[in-house]
Amino acid sequence: NLNKNGLTVTRDEFIVREEVYIYPDTLVWISDFTYSQNDPMTKGYFSHPSFSNYPVVGVSWKQAKAFTVWRSRLNEAYKLSKNLPLRLDYDLPTEAQFEYAARGGRVGTSYPWGGPYIRNAKGCLLANFKPGRGNYVDDGGAFTVYVKSYFPNDYGLYNMAGNVSEWTSSIYNETATAYVNSLNPSFDKAVKEGDPDYNKRRVVKGGSWKDIGYFLQNSARAYEYPDSEENI
């Protein structure tokens, strides 16, 4: 192939291989979660069977993306071995796809459960998050909780708000609303190794156990850097 200057471009110049350390950061409870019983959590969260159905934490965007590639290849190999038709690859959702899934088919709702409030009619909190300043336990959990602790949304999806935040594939930009629409719902661009860090930010959605209720809203958006391994 020739580039715009008429020079030959080799395959190695536009296909980049990167090895990604796949295991989550098991020390994340000490390094990032300063008020979460971090010593016993560090020792048991990733190994004790009591946490088997708790969400994984300490996963960077690169690790999450690498997992989708591995899972797609595993699925492809299985389908080929059984002579079954292939299907679409696994991937991280775009910001728009995540919000669509979080709404569960509802229109104009603030939260995945469909209502505008974070409590039900009996005063019970509807997700695992931080209800107030320094208050992590009012919802019954001082940190992450069992993934089915709260009801799923109308699509049957759990934890679309609270517990842990979720990575998306979308680049974060404060002015993204000026560029996205129904025909182009995701703001994205090619990120190069030498780009400044603010160009590499990725949208995270859903809010986590250590976020206030605002970030649990379907429309709320935040960002993390690709190498971040915090409450995600």
Residue ranges and their predicted role:
Residues 10-230:
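Functional-site microenvironments in short loops/helix caps that host divalent-cation chemistry
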Residues 3-5:
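Non-catalytic, alpha-helical, charged scaffold/linker segments
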